[in-house]
Amino acid sequence: MGSSNLELIFDSVGHFGRYQIFLYFICAFQNISCGIHYLASVFLSVSPQHTCRPPGNVSQVLFQDLSTWQLEDIWTQFSVGREDRILVQLQDGAIWELTSCQRFRRDDQSSLDYEYSGQKSSFPCLDGYIYDRSKWLSTVVTQWDLVCNREWFGRLIQPTFMFGVLLGAVIFGYLSDRAGRRLVLWASSTGVFLFGIAAAFTFDYYSFIVARFLLAISGSGYLVVVFVYVTEFVGMKSRTWASIHLHSFFAFGTMVVALTGYFVRTWWIYQIVLSSVTVPFVLCCWMLPETPFWLISGGKYEEAQKVIDTMAKWNRTRPCKLSEILSLDHDGSAGNKPSQVEKHTLSELFYDWSIGTRTLILWLIWFTGCLGFYTFSLNSVHLGGSEYLNLFLMGVVEIPAYVLVCLGMDRVGRRNILIFSLLSSAVTSGVIMVIPKDYHVWLVVASMAGKFFIGAAFGLIYLYTAELYPTIVRSLAVGSGSTVGRVGSIVAPLCIYLSSVWIFMPQLLVGTLALVSGVLTFLLPETLRRPLTTTWEETEKESSSGKLLSTTSNTVLENVTVENSEDSSLNK
């Protein structure tokens, strides 16, 4: 059945009535949970100041000008980023020099003094570490000593999670077309809850990574399928607005992470609290109906009619008869008769030199958008001041970014908004690099601006990509772009660690990519008020003619999500 005829359903029962609003906010609520887990590692994997634990009971501690009886008292004097030696004398009289990753035993034990020129022996930290617990009572790092030669274990927590995100989009996108959207929404959200709780009760690092990996697969699967679910229940007149603002609920998840991190300072309790956000949706999701689009595609017309009747009843509108709409296809009076869906390969995105260049530019924009989105968020806790407030503000600033996209894309054009957002993000990254690191407030403000612009670019790239390709490869183009974007998400936490080379290295990388992407976007055509094309020939003709015709962005989302929901994923 032609997908255009299905829109007659919404013309009858309403494009965004009470029923769709009810379903929309139920589904969007779970997006908060996904946003939570995507950034939960910001505080889960905090690595506090630490020093080697001495091999015995301490009788006296000397640190700079502080003399005390226990090591825990020295953290107020500790300098961040400075390798300070701590002198301790054990109850057996042995004197040790302690650093963050090594300890030295002095041969001469006559006096506890920094001035020492005698022999000393080096030993690894076999007795573990003592951590500064003034901020966090416990983190994953302190739980399993992920410091020094095990530091890279801690640095893999977020990249492995993002790899799970990549895998989950593929798995659940495939399953949703076979088993239905409703079942997959229930399974993925249940997985988010169960694996989120399981991560809090893991017994070692490896089981924690596995639980988080499965959590990422489930959360990513939900984000993929909920986008399809929402767009198949919302009519064309409201579809673009509704789909873009699903991002806003993800941003609320970022704020919840910041608030929870502020009030809960033990990692496993923090993990349980964050995972509990999923409970309301898990309890309610069994009430969600299957989408009429999926039911019709599977020949379940009676079930589809029941859902349509329910929509009409809730919306207080006139119900439509599905049999009448279906008959339009059979008598040929509207739409087209169903045809076999032809499989297309990635090579078709390189149809010719011009299209191949277009594809590579869009892939770069997808990569830059995801890389910048997570780099600004993850790096916010390193800007100074309150890391909790910083992260909270990074979530707040996303919401006006999506409003900008919705208001601006139909007025000044998709390409112009994208160019402005990318170049502004590049300029903001440059501004951050010239702000002295002691100016915490200005660094946070500039980072918020960077997150605003890169968020706007990311919120628009899905729609823009869909409009640049003909119907025969539209889903493939969007799916490949989102996959490249997820690679950027995997790289983002690794990019943050480059700050150990130079404090502003992450901003330099993001700013450079945003600048290059913004300049290259000038080579792409504008799609505002241009008709969607079906074949490559139409695409070439439209590009060469430059003719402007009336169309709506909502049609793009309808075509992409209905024709091949497996590849159409709006996934962070």
From Swiss-Prot:
Positions of glycan attachment: N57, N315, N559
Gene it is expressed from: SLC22A16
Membrane association type: Multi-pass membrane protein
Function: Facilitative organic cation transporter that mediates the transport of carnitine as well as the polyamine spermidine. Mediates the partially Na(+)-dependent bidirectional transport of carnitine. May mediate L-carnitine secretion from testis epididymal epithelium into the lumen which is involved in the maturation of spermatozoa.
Record localization: Cell membrane
Residue ranges crossing the lipid bilayer per the database entry: 21-41, 156-176, 183-203, 208-228, 244-264, 268-288, 359-379, 389-409, 416-436, 441-461, 476-496, 503-523
Broad class of where this protein is predominantly found: membrane
Family note: Belongs to the major facilitator (TC 2.A.1) superfamily. Organic cation transporter (TC 2.A.1.19) family.
Cross-referenced PANTHER family: SOLUTE CARRIER FAMILY 22 MEMBER
Keyword Cell membrane assigned: yes
Keyword Ion transport: yes
Name of the protein: Solute carrier family 22 member 16
Gene3D superfamilies xrefs: MFS general substrate transporter like domains (1.20.1250.20)
One GO CC term on file: cytosol
Reaction catalyzed: (R)-carnitine(in) = (R)-carnitine(out); spermidine(in) = spermidine(out)
Organism, as annotated: Bos taurus
Domain of life, source organism: Eukaryota
One Pfam family hit: Sugar_tr
GO biological process: acid secretion; carnitine transmembrane transport; cell differentiation; flagellated sperm motility; monoatomic ion transport; organic cation transport; single fertilization; spermatogenesis
